[in-house]
């Protein structure tokens, strides 16, 4: 959806149509909110079942695994809802802001990895919680920057079905391509876990970095 959102915002900017720009941004937020809802429903049903019933996780690490899983769902939702703001910044060609925020995000992630050495709590849980908090902070920064610099970046309660259908259709092919890549990468990780246990997942995770 990122490329579709960016494309439609850029087109509206080129036309100089502020009303269309507001429609595109608000429609994009609605689409991403719907995607987030689907992620939550699937994650808290099929995902939890798969975690408890199929994945090979030592009993003493199950609590940590559940924490990581729930934080991952929350982080995914935050990332999904950040897409319209990211696309808006790129469409307006504010690359310096995008670069500075990205540098801040990477620096914070490096900081929490370094802080794990000093953490008195479970390091896996600590990393998952702080990763989610960083995603939330970056999302707030993007939203604040966009609302301050781009008037269209404030949500308006509009429902424009033709635009919704057009954006969804445009994003369809890239969606299936990205979904295939995710299923290949994460599906392989899950298969390795199911047949060989977590001992094989660790080197696999390092290998694909």
Predicted regions and their residues:
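Helix-terminus/linker motif at the lipid-water interface of multi-pass membrane proteins
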Residues: 52-56, 117-120, 182-209
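Interhelical loop/hinge segments that connect adjacent transmembrane helices in multipass membrane
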Residues: 124-130, 142-190, 194, 199-200
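Alpha-helical transmembrane segments of multi-pass membrane proteins
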Residues: 45-48, 57-82, 99, 103, ...
């Amino acid at each position: 959806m990122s490329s579709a959102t960016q494309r439609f915002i850029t087109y509206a900017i080129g036309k100089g149509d502020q009303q269309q720009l507001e429609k595109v941004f608000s429609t994009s937020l609605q689409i991403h909110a719907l995607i987030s809802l689907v992620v939550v429903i699937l994650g808290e049903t099929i995902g939890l079942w798969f975690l408890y019933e199929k994945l090979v996780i030592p009993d003493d690490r199950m609590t940590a695994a559940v924490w990581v899983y729930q934080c991952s769902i929350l982080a995914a939702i935050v990332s999904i809802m950040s897409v319209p703001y990211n696309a808006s910044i790129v469409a307006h060609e504010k690359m310096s802001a995008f670069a500075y925020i990205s540098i801040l995000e990477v620096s914070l992630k490096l900081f929490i990895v370094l802080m794990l050495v000093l953490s008195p709590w479970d390091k896996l849980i600590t990393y998952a919680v702080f990763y989610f908090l960083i995603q939330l902070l970056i999302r707030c920064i993007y939203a604040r920057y966009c609302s301050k610099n781009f008037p269209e970046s404030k949500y308006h309660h509009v429902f424009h079905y033709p635009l919704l259908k057009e954006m969804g259709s445009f994003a369809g092919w890239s969606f299936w391509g990205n979904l295939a890549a995710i299923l290949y990468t994460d599906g392989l990780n899950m298969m390795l876990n199911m047949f060989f246990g977590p001992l094989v997942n660790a080197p696999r995770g390092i290998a694909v970095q």
